[in-house]
């Protein structure tokens, strides 16, 4: 028995063949997001993508947008600062109904979070087994079946680590813009360079374009800015390494629910500005950076 056998194809949809959901074209999936603007958030593992995604979703909602955030990580902690709890995953809920999606209602797997942000956690198979990308693909199908992607202004995909192969690249097939979360250090920038290459490859056949990067948990931005200048890329936000952001995670809240300390107010303003920048970016030509070779990055940022 394959480790993936515990996650069968969703009944009620055309069969795709084992594992094929993760590499299908968007036309095959038939995803219709209506007029929603779709953003995929990528970055090195542990860089703060979920914190960035949740506060970005909150900022969009405060700008009057209807927002849906989709966590694409087996840890299923993408949305807990929006909802105040760890949300049950789509895959676990499907198991409860023996993988009969027609028995589910949106409220069975969608939780309303801060300021009306709708939250979904795709989940994933146990560690070391199955295909997480397959789970993401099936979640997208379920959202399509219930027309949830059509009834929003903004969709935010919070994607696992810096994995941009197969299924975890699937959000790029539907995204208008990809946002990369990085930090002012070599490893984070190295991961960003590889993500840029993956997004550029997808952009040949899909509408996705790069929006820019966020320098996160960083006092300075000099290394990020040096890379951006060399690769013709752009930093569009800077989130310093603030203790208030760490405390908000511990309190299971977005920054917009914290007390009005000076650093909190500053961070909120930066997230609002980021949301406004991303919203405008979909009506403008996307960035077209040139990813650097490994040797070039080492020479640019590595040790002397």
Curated annotation (Swiss-Prot):
Pfam families named among the record's database cross-references? Fer4_NifH
Entry annotated with the keyword DNA-binding: no
Q: Which residues form a coiled coil?
A: none
GO MF annotations in UniProt:
4 iron, 4 sulfur cluster binding; ATP binding; metal ion binding; oxidoreductase activity, acting on iron-sulfur proteins as donors; oxidoreductase activity, acting on the CH-CH group of donors, iron-sulfur protein as acceptor
This protein's name: Light-independent protochlorophyllide reductase iron-sulfur ATP-binding protein
Keyword terms of this UniProt record: 4Fe-4S, ATP-binding, Bacteriochlorophyll biosynthesis, Chlorophyll biosynthesis, Iron, Iron-sulfur, Magnesium, Metal-binding, Nucleotide-binding, Oxidoreductase, Photosynthesis
Q: What class of enzyme is it?
A: oxidoreductase
GO terms for biological process, alphabetical: light-independent bacteriochlorophyll biosynthetic process; photosynthesis, dark reaction
Q: Which residues bind ATP?
A: 46-51, 75, 216-217, 240-242
User: According to its UniProt record, which protein family does this protein belong to?
Assistant: Belongs to the NifH/BchL/ChlL family.
Question: What reaction gets catalysed by this protein?
Answer: chlorophyllide a + oxidized 2[4Fe-4S]-[ferredoxin] + 2 ADP + 2 phosphate = protochlorophyllide a + reduced 2[4Fe-4S]-[ferredoxin] + 2 ATP + 2 H2O
